[in-house]
């Protein structure tokens, strides 16, 4: 979690979270050890993919922002790894669907099925490799730009 407040909220909303090993900050130290992540859509989803962490993605915003986005932005996915793969690799939950029941269910599906985690990590190898070394951010931005133009 980014801060103690978010961790406390998660514990209140999802009772199962109280039993999980939660970390505050230190993302790059925590991700290599993580079995699963729940992340808000943004660059953190790409970091999760880079570290091969199965991730459940959520996106919540004001309804007006959401509706305007739906009108003007035509993409099938919101998580960068899904955009790069051209399909859903990380499960995504948007607006009302981004609720504690759906997020916990998907996170537990990853936790309960080591085979599913391994399969996903192999898919994430392909995504991470597509980012390459130096200049990767530029290549990722170009890929997204091409998708937005289409």
Outline where the language-model segments fall:
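Nucleotide-activated sugar donor-binding and catalytic core shared by glycosyltransferases
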Residues: 1-150
């Amino acid at each position: 979690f980014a801060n103690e407040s978010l961790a406390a909220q998660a514990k209140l909303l999802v009772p199962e979270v109280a039993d999980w090993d939660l970390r505050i900050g230190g993302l790059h130290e925590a991700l290599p050890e993580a079995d699963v992540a729940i992340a808000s859509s943004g660059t953190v989803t790409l970091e999760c993919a880079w570290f091969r962490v199965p991730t459940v993605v959520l996106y919540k915003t004001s309804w007006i922002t959401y509706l305007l986005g739906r009108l003007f932005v035509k993409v099938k996915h919101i998580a960068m790894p899904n955009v790069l793969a051209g399909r859903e690799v990380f499960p995504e939950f948007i607006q009302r669907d981004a609720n504690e029941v759906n997020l916990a269910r998907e996170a537990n599906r990853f936790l309960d099925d080591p085979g599913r985690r391994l399969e996903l990590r192999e898919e994430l190898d392909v995504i991470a490799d597509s980012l390459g070394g130096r200049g990767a951010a530029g290549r990722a931005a170009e890929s997204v730009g091409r998708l937005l133009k289409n």
